[in-house]
Structures are given as structure tokens and as C-alpha cells.
A protein has these predicted regions:
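N-terminal cap/lid segment of alpha/beta-hydrolase-fold proteins
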Residues: 20-50
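Short substrate-entry loop that stabilizes the transition state in hydrolases
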Residues: 46-52, 57-100, 188-189, 209-212
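Primarily recognizes the serine-hydrolase "nucleophile elbow" in alpha/beta-hydrolase
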Residues: 83, 127-196
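Alpha/beta-hydrolase-fold catalytic nucleophile elbow
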Residues: 91, 147-149, 180-183, 203-204, ...
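The feature captures the conserved acid-bearing segment of alpha/beta-hydrolase catalytic domains
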Residues: 169-244
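C-terminal catalytic histidine-bearing segment of alpha/beta-hydrolase fold enzymes
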Residues: 235-291
Length: 291
């Protein structure tokens, strides 16, 4: 019996070690003396040359908090690998951390836009690093999905849909195959064009009190507030995608507030199935799920 227990413990430890070896951490940039890192989670590969669709995830936290390797982000990435994806979770500069206004109605609108821009730049630098090392990391550079929650969603939506507005064409060599946004919004809806529109999954609560579900001021600031900045939320993004004939999967929560920015683990199978269908099989899907 003791021998069986010892063997079982050894096998369990070995399997845990094997799984842990699938996560690797890299520094993709150093800015303002801060090393910006990313974690790459990968499934077992059938061959050294195999490349897979890749989710590149940006955590939330109001641009003042959050970490790339918290429990939820880690679980998301592990789930993605089980679905046959490479998953990456990135750190980025938290430019509102320690400021007196943070990211609310006292934060000037110009600073909010600059925060979106710098976060988008960090995101694109991370993706550039991944593309440069795509052979070693088994990344299919034609099937990169940009994903993020709350502040992270705002950043990735800016990076994917508004590259000319925020990035001045500096990353034109990068293209995305999909978007996965949790309670995100963007400044200019017209920047979503036939060139930038890609299959998109969005989750948003109609009663979101921070990031507007439709078109409204960020944090619902008053017009006289320094931080008054009108954003277009998921509902408006879906309208634009529909107009352009682009695939989308939209989860709309009637009474949902900003907690909908949490990772929807119960729906991840459907989310990844959507990307497999639209990105891999080129199937056209337009679906709204109301809850």
C-alpha cells in the first residue's frame, strides 16, 4: 500500500511538473526602468513546427492595478491551452497607479486618451515580441486574438480597431484575427472599418456603471467634469460590426454591472468554439445572447 501511495504521489508530482513546464515567462520590453513581462501557456505539440491560434490577454484594473498572473488570468490561459490555443497574459505600465485622480471623473480626458494610447503601445510591443519569436513559441501569426478585461479591453480595442488614431501606423505589420472583450469600449466608432473589423466576442452589462454599454461618458462623468469622455461600448461596437458584415458573438446582461468584466468561465467553450469556427473554418456567425 505504501509503495502504491508513493508511486501515485510521484506520478502526480511528475504530471504537475510537466504542466508547469508549459508556462514560460519572458521580458518583452523595459520602459521607465520597469521590465514588462508576459507568460506564455502552451499545450503539448504534435510536432516542433506546429503553430496554433493564440490569445494574447490584457488584464483589467483601471490602469492602476491588476497582475497578469492572478488566479483568473491563469485559469483562462490554462483553459485556452486545453482548447488547442496558445495563450499569453501580459503585464503593462499601470500609468494611473499612484496618481491623485486615478481614472475617474477628475482625470482629464486628454490623460485618459493618452493612457489608452500608451497601454495600446505596450500591448502591440508584446505582440511584436511574440511575432518575432513565433517559431519557438508555436504561434500562428495569422491567427492572433486580442483579448482583455475592463481597462485591458479598452486598450486592446484601441490597438485593434484604432491603430491609425493611436499608433500612427507604427505597427502596420501586425494584424489580428479576432477580439475578445469583457466590458470594453472605445473612443471613435468610425475607426472600425472593413480593414480593422475582425470576428469579435463581447460581454457587457447594460447597467455597467463604469464603462458604458452603449454610447455615454466614461464613468458617466458630467459634461463639466475634467474626465468627461464619451465612449462607445459593446452595443455600439456590435452595431458597427453588423453594418460591416463581420462575425460577432455578443453576451448582453440586462441587469449586469461592471462585474461582467470578470472572466466568463462557464461560457469559454462557446467562446473558443466561435473563434475556431470564424477564424479557422471561416464561418460567418452573428449572434446575440441576452441574459
Amino acid at each position: 500500500m505504501k509503495l502504491k501511495i508513493a508511486v501515485w504521489v510521484l506520478l502526480l508530482s511528475f504530471s504537475t511538473l510537466l504542466f508547469a513546464q508549459q508556462k514560460k515567462t519572458y521580458t518583452y520590453a523595459t520602459k521607465d526602468g520597469q521590465e514588462l513581462q508576459l507568460d506564455v501557456y502552451a499545450p503539448d505539440f504534435s510536432s516542433k513546427s506546429e503553430k496554433l491560434p493564440t490569445l494574447v490577454w490584457m488584464h483589467g484594473g483601471g490602469f492602476s492595478g491588476g497582475v497578469r498572473d492572478n488566479q483568473s488570468e491563469t485559469k483562462l490561459c490554462e483553459t485556452a491551452t486545453k482548447q488547442g490555443f496558445v495563450a499569453v497574459s501580459i503585464s503593462y505600465r499601470l500609468l494611473r497607479k499612484g496618481t491623485s485622480t486615478y481614472f475617474g471623473c477628475d482625470c482629464p480626458a486628454a490623460e485618459k486618451k493618452e493612457t489608452f494610447k500608451q497601454a495600446a503601445i505596450d500591448y502591440m510591443d508584446a505582440v511584436s515580441f511574440l511575432i518575432d519569436h513565433s517559431d519557438d513559441l508555436h504561434i500562428d501569426t495569422d491567427k492572433i486574438i486580442a483579448g482583455g478585461s475592463s481597462a485591458g479591453a479598452e486598450a486592446i480595442l484601441s490597438a485593434v480597431y484604432m491603430p491609425e488614431y493611436y499608433l500612427d501606423g507604427a505597427y502596420d505589420q501586425i494584424s489580428f484575427a479576432g477580439v475578445f472583450s469583457l466590458a470594453g469600449a472605445l473612443v471613435n466608432l468610425d475607426e472600425i472599418t472593413s480593414k480593422t473589423a475582425v470576428p469579435t466576442v463581447l460581454f457587457h452589462g447594460i447597467a455597467d456603471n463604469l464603462v458604458p454599454y452603449s454610447k455615454a461618458a466614461h464613468h458617466y462623468c458630467n459634461p463639466k467634469d475634467a474626465g468627461y469622455l464619451v465612449l462607445n461600448g459593446s452595443d455600439k461596437i456590435v452595431d458597427r460590426l453588423s453594418l460591416l458584415g463581420t462575425s460577432y458573438l455578443f453576451y448582453s446582461y440586462e441587469k449586469g454591472r461592471h462585474e461582467i468584466s470578470g472572466i466568463p468561465f462557464g461560457d469559454l467553450t462557446d467562446v473558443f468554439d466561435f473563434f475556431k469556427s470564424t477564424i479557422v473554418k471561416d464561418t460567418h456567425i452573428t449572434k446575440t445572447i441576452s441574459r
